[in-house]
């Protein structure tokens, strides 16, 4: 009999991606953040997600007042620049959860056949991601929805830079009410520092940002929260060390 863990990992994207995309789109239309974490708890408790190993990470940006500022394409390259007036960022890693309010800012989405770059820049948050994937043609049209599996990723914020060879799914949903949902699911937390691969992972406080004091007024039923002065990659790195 074949290894059940290998079978679960093989068919995990087929199980998660369609369900995840439909549920996130439905949740995005609902203003109750508690439903989001209920969905995350359901997914994390499924047999496929219960395989021993690093936990799954969920990052969700919910933005409003979104407008397209610039869009241009080349035969093998596409770039879109968005502006938004505000929103929120939700995270769930293992038993921890967090939701921060975001001020207005800009989004840059660059797409090639093998790499997709995502940069979110506002006064309360800056994060940049690069996702490596197989040939995938993005159709960036208004009111579009897409889910793109990736094989590895690189991320940077004002306090840290990480890369990981674990895969996941990037989803972008744009609605006709000037709103957007960007979700990132990472199937594990085995991460490395590009600038130093020989030394042990530093303690989390070395990656703590004192740059911002975000509001944490998004409702959540979870009792545990990340500290308010951590950046996205700092949180991922901290939980990777404890995985």
Swiss-Prot record:
Location relative to the cell: Host nucleus
One Pfam family cited in the UniProt record for this chain: Herpes_UL4
Entry keyword set: Host nucleus
Residues in the signal sequence: none
Comp. bias (Polar residues): 205-219
Gene Ontology annotations for the cellular component aspect, listed alphabetically: host cell nucleus
Region feature Disordered, mapped onto this chain: 193-226
Name used for this protein in its record: Nuclear protein UL4 homolog
